[in-house]
């Protein structure tokens, strides 16, 4: 099986608390984690900050439980979009956005969900779990997102903390599974404290409550997560690629512009 991953450890101003989250994840057997910086443009003067450098957290990375290698720490940016204008930062080649390994979008309306699935250059689409779903999922945009290699993220942290959130999480997850059939789904903790992280096998079992099959539940904490950060690598690389088009030689261009009958005479 691919390495286990939790792609949503919440970044805060307290580096000591963040170190505790990463250490706990390593102890539970996660090989990869992502530190998630969330930007909500509804709040005044919110800007995309530079991601936290791994060197700020650790001089020596924690070793993954049961492995001989250190944990891998990725950086993630999640942008909450409530207005189409908020998507502009994702359409442009923003230098700050490019600094992050994973870029996620949290659409709050059906229209924005459709745009996220079909057009935005992101790696993850976040699904709300803290309130009743404000719209119904439709198959066309979900299928386009799957074809584009985007992941759908469900977080289990709120379901652990609150009974009402648990109902919302399960209900919204089941609605998603009816459409995507478990494809490209990842499960993350959204943990702010170490006690909110669960072991990968427990999370995979939790996926059964969300409508995932046993195999899809395991993939949601392993292979699907790997696909997400590989998608991020491809996205970042694509920014640096300049495509070139071979121009035809003048004689070739002239030949192409001639009618077929005249070309035949010339060749004769």
Swiss-Prot record:
Name used for this protein in its record: Ribonuclease P protein subunit p30
Keywords from the UniProt entry: Acetylation, Nucleus, Phosphoprotein, rRNA processing, tRNA processing
Residues that bear Phosphoserine: 251
Family: Belongs to the eukaryotic/archaeal RNase P protein component 3 family.
Domain of life (superkingdom): Eukaryota
GO BP: rRNA processing; tRNA 5'-leader removal
Job description of the protein: Component of ribonuclease P, a ribonucleoprotein complex that generates mature tRNA molecules by cleaving their 5'-ends. Also a component of the MRP ribonuclease complex, which cleaves pre-rRNA sequences.
Organism whose genome encodes this protein: Mus musculus
Subcellular location: Nucleus, Nucleolus
Modified residues (N-acetylalanine): 2
Sample GO molecular function, one term: ribonuclease P RNA binding
Gene: Rpp30
Main location: nucleus
InterPro entries: Pol/histidinol_Pase-like, RNase_P_p30
GO cellular component, as recorded: multimeric ribonuclease P complex; nucleolus; ribonuclease MRP complex
């Amino acid at each position: 099986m691919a390495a286990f991953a939790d792609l949503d450890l919440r970044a805060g101003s307290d580096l000591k608390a963040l170190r505790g989250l990463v250490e706990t994840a390593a102890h539970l057997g996660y090989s990869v984690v992502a530190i998630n910086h969330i930007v909500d443009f509804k709040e005044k003067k919110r800007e995309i900050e530079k991601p936290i450098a791994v060197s700020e957290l650790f001089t020596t990375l924690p070793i993954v439980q049961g492995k001989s290698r250190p944990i891998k720490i990725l950086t993630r940016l999640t942008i909450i979009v409530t207005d189409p204008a908020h998507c502009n930062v994702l359409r442009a080649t923003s230098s700050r956005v490019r600094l992050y390994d994973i870029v996620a979008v949290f659409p709050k309306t059906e229209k924005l969900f459709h745009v996220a699935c079909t057009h935005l250059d992101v790696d993850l689409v976040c699904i709300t779990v803290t309130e009743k779903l404000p719209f119904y999922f439709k198959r066309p945009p979900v299928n386009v997102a799957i074809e584009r290699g985007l992941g759908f993220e469900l977080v289990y942290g709120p379901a652990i903390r609150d009974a009402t959130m648990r109902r919302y999480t399960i209900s919204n997850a089941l609605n998603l599974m009816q459409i995507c059939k478990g494809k490209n789904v990842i499960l993350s903790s959204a943990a702010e404290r170490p006690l909110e992280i669960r072991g990968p096998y427990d999370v995979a079992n939790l996926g059964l409550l969300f409508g995932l099959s046993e195999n899809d539940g395991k993939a949601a904490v392993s292979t699907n997560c790997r696909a997400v950060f590989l998608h991020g690598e491809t996205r970042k690389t694509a920014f640096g690629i300049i495509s070139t088009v071979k121009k035809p030689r003048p004689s070739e261009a002239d030949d192409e512009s001639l009618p077929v009958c005249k070309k035949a005479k010339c060749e004769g």
